[in-house]
Swiss-Prot record:
Its main location: cytoplasm. Belongs to the class-II aminoacyl-tRNA synthetase family. Phe-tRNA synthetase alpha subunit type 1 subfamily. This is Phenylalanine--tRNA ligase alpha subunit. Its cofactor is Mg(2+). CDD domains: PheRS_alpha_core (cd00496). It catalyses: tRNA(Phe) + L-phenylalanine + ATP = L-phenylalanyl-tRNA(Phe) + AMP + diphosphate + H(+). GO terms for molecular function: ATP binding; magnesium ion binding; phenylalanine-tRNA ligase activity; tRNA binding. The keyword Endoplasmic reticulum does not apply. Keywords: Aminoacyl-tRNA synthetase, ATP-binding, Cytoplasm, Ligase, Magnesium, Metal-binding, Nucleotide-binding, Protein biosynthesis.
């Protein structure tokens, strides 16, 4: 019986001198584990008489229970010390001023798209988003773009398979809308388009806004008036504009629109024209009763001109210093 008491005294000293949870676990396993000291003491009972065994068991269980309580008590104490240290480490002085929340800045591309939406809404245009993954029919066939056209080449277009691709122009939305809606139609389609090109004036992904009007008696003069007014409003000045005859498979006549830059050079900013009768036929609109005009604006290009940005790639490099320049636009 004296052995048990000495054992408990030894346990108490070890528990008292343990300063970590790991050390305490080691003590627990040493004394209370399956192969621990208390388990081994049970084996000695075979040498005791029945009466001695009863007395031994009473003291044994009492000592074992005290040992468990001592270990649990010490564990609570050590956990409290750990928690106190953690709280002290993470202590916050509420009297200190808080960190200032920095305001975000609208990206110049988003700002331009918003400006365009607001301008054309005043002329009765609605804005609709479209699919960025298109099929060959809506992106090419229905827009009167033949099979041998260079734009359909794998070097210029991102193809998923023989039929699906990343749209190369927002014009594909013209087909989808004209199939569903009956004239009169006045819509713009802002969105991303994709072409396999990358340099200071081209990126594989860029933004366009397509405009479409389908009405009776709409003509090229109406289209010119809209474009003149938009560009002069956008650049906030009576900017010199040139309509240059061009070719697009889906419009006839077609034109590219150039503006005079600050250094006196002409720069193309958009394409436009009267929607080709074949395109109207593809969407079951009778070109004898209705005419249609369309225009496509390159968002990055007019934004570069407006704010004097020299490299198109700056829009997509995520340089916060670049974005901050447009804080007050």
């Amino acid at each position: 019986m004296l052995i048990l008491q000495k054992l408990f005294d030894s346990v108490k000293i070890e528990i008292k001198n343990s300063h970590t949870i790991d050390k305490l676990d080691h003590i627990r396993i040493k004394y209370l584990g399956k192969k621990g000291i208390f388990s081994n003491l049970i084996k000695d009972l075979k040498n005791f008489s029945l009466e001695e065994r009863k007395k031994y068991f009473i003291i044994f269980n009492e000592i074992k229970k005290k040992t468990i309580n001592q270990i649990n008590k010490k564990k609570i104490e050590l956990n409290k010390i750990i928690l106190d240290k953690q709280i002290e480490k993470e202590k916050i002085d509420v009297s200190l001023p808080g960190r200032r929340i920095k305001n975000g800045v609208i990206h110049p591309i988003n700002h331009t798209i918003t400006y365009i939406k607001n301008f054309f809404s005043k002329l009765g245009f609605e804005s609709i988003s479209g699919f960025e993954i298109e099929d060959e029919y809506h992106n090419f066939d229905a827009l009167n773009i033949p099979k041998d056209h260079p734009a359909r080449n794998i070097h210029d277009t991102f193809w998923f398979d023989e039929n699906r691709l990343l749209r190369t122009q927002t014009s594909s939305m013209q087909i989808r809308i004209m199939k569903k809606e009956k004239p009169p139609i006045r819509l713009i389609f802002p969105g991303k388009v994709y072409r396999n090109d990358y340099d200071s004036t081209h990126t594989p992904m860029f933004h366009q806004v397509e405009g479409l009007i389908v009405e009776k008696n709409i003509n090229f003069s109406n289209l010119k008036w809209i474009i003149y007014n938009f560009l002069r409003n956008f650049f906030h000045k009576d900017i010199a504009i040139r309509f240059r005859p061009s070719y697009f498979p889906f419009t006839t006549p077609s034109a590219e629109v150039d503006v005079v830059t600050n250094n006196g050079k002409l720069l193309e900013v958009l394409g436009c024209g009267m929607v080709h009768p074949s395109v109207l036929k593809n969407v079951n609109i009778d070109s004898n009763f209705y005419s249609a005009c369309a225009f496509g604006i390159g968002i990055e290009r007019i934004t570069m001109l407006r704010y004097g940005i020299s490299d198109l790639r700056s829009f997509f490099e995520n340089d916060i210093r670049f974005i901050k320049q447009f804080k007050h636009i």
